[in-house]
Amino acid sequence: MVLLAASGFNLLKVNPGLVIWTLVTFSVVVFVLKKFAWDKILHALEERASGIQGDINKAESLRVEAEKSLKEYKDQLFKATEEAHRIVDEAKKDAVALRTKLTEEAHNEVKGIKDSAVREIELAKGRALSEIQNQIVEMSVLIASEILEKQLKKEDYASFVEKEIAKLDKLKIK
């Protein structure tokens, strides 16, 4: 620019012929564009704007759908967690009930075995005492028969001794 100014060419000087031809050329270009391309350009711009608006609307609907899906997922997760807690609690209750039942059954079984053993011991004791009494009766009969030197009938003397032992048992009980 310094060179142009030095050579005497003035850039700031307005040339009226150049201004007119520039305006005429510009007007012709605008007219040609308006006549042949303006509608197509506007139509393309409108299509582009509607496409962008459609994409925005689609993105918004996808966002809403994603939020809805996320909420449903969180609800399902919450329900699944609650169900899992319920199942665990129920399993704990079942385990406690089963433990109580098994403990009670074992206790009852032990009690039954103990009662059975006590009955068997009592029966064995009764048989042993009965056998001892019978032996005592027999020995008493033998001793008494030798002492008296008289042979009594064994059954008579045995019944006599049994009656006497029964009297002694009654006295012991009182």
From Swiss-Prot:
For membrane topology, the record states: Single-pass membrane protein
GO molecular function list: proton-transporting ATP synthase activity, rotational mechanism; proton-transporting ATPase activity, rotational mechanism
Protein name, entry field: ATP synthase subunit b
Establish whether keyword Protein transport is in the entry.
no
Q: Where are the transmembrane segments?
A: 15-33
Q: Which gene encodes it?
A: atpF
List the GO cellular component terms: plasma membrane; proton-transporting ATP synthase complex
Q: Which family does it belong to?
A: Belongs to the ATPase B chain family.
Query: What are the UniProt keywords, alphabetically?
Result: ATP synthesis, Cell inner membrane, Cell membrane, CF(0), Hydrogen ion transport, Ion transport, Membrane, Transmembrane, Transmembrane helix, Transport
Annotated InterPro entries: ATP_synth_B-like_membr_sf (IPR028987), ATP_synth_b/b'su_bac/chlpt (IPR002146), ATP_synth_F0_bsu_bac (IPR005864), ATP_synthase_B_chain (IPR050059)
Q: Indicate where this protein is primarily found.
A: membrane
Q: Which organism does this sequence originate in?
A: Leptospira biflexa serovar Patoc (strain Patoc 1 / ATCC 23582 / Paris)
Under CDD domains, the record lists: ATP-synt_Fo_b
Subunit-structure text: F-type ATPases have 2 components, F(1) - the catalytic core - and F(0) - the membrane proton channel. F(1) has five subunits: alpha(3), beta(3), gamma(1), delta(1), epsilon(1). F(0) has three main subunits: a(1), b(2) and c(10-14). The alpha and beta chains form an alternating ring which encloses part of the gamma chain. F(1) is attached to F(0) by a central stalk formed by the gamma and epsilon chains, while a peripheral stalk is formed by the delta and b chains.
Q: What NCBIfam families does UniProt report for this protein, alphabetically?
A: ATP_synt_b, PRK13460.1
